[in-house]
Amino acid sequence: SQEGAGMLREKGIPARSLKGGYTGWLFQQMQKESKKGDGEETENEAMEQRRKDIELSIRKKFHKQLFTRFARGINDYELVKPGDKIAVCISGGKDSMLMAKLFQELKRHNKFPFELVFLVMDPGYNEANRAVIEHNAKLLGIPITVFETEIFDAVYNVEKSPCYLCARMRRGYLYSKAKEL
């Protein structure tokens, strides 16, 4: 609460209220981010600069730890061949977003052409979760294709292993969608 955070600050403890929970805080950050700039810089310009900074860190700071190993694995096991169409499925988490960026980087430097498609399956997210995924994809320059399902509704009343069933159904939908492409 605001009151609790104020009491902690009075005692010299840095604190703030997370009114609306983590999602509320995250939306505040997204709004602040869209207002950043020197007055002349637009939201798109600010996002573009942030995207470039992130991509530069992948290329420079994390090149050896991430990209070199990723590219070596792709090449050693011949996972991508000329003319392939690859669907990168994005959950919205850091792992799938990073995987998408690594594939974009691979395509940028690869010796042969291949296609990339970035899929996001909405199994019944609330508006806030979906907005965060879309915002982060836009920020990172990942052109996502979103398709909706009602998986969350389908497993809502399942008592035994709903997480297992949900995961299987999500994979099934993703495989089907990837085959359509």
Residue ranges and their predicted role:
Residues 1-48:
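Rhodanese-like catalytic fold shared by cysteine-dependent sulfurtransferases
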Residues 42-181:
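ATP-dependent adenylation/nucleotidyltransferase module used to activate substrates
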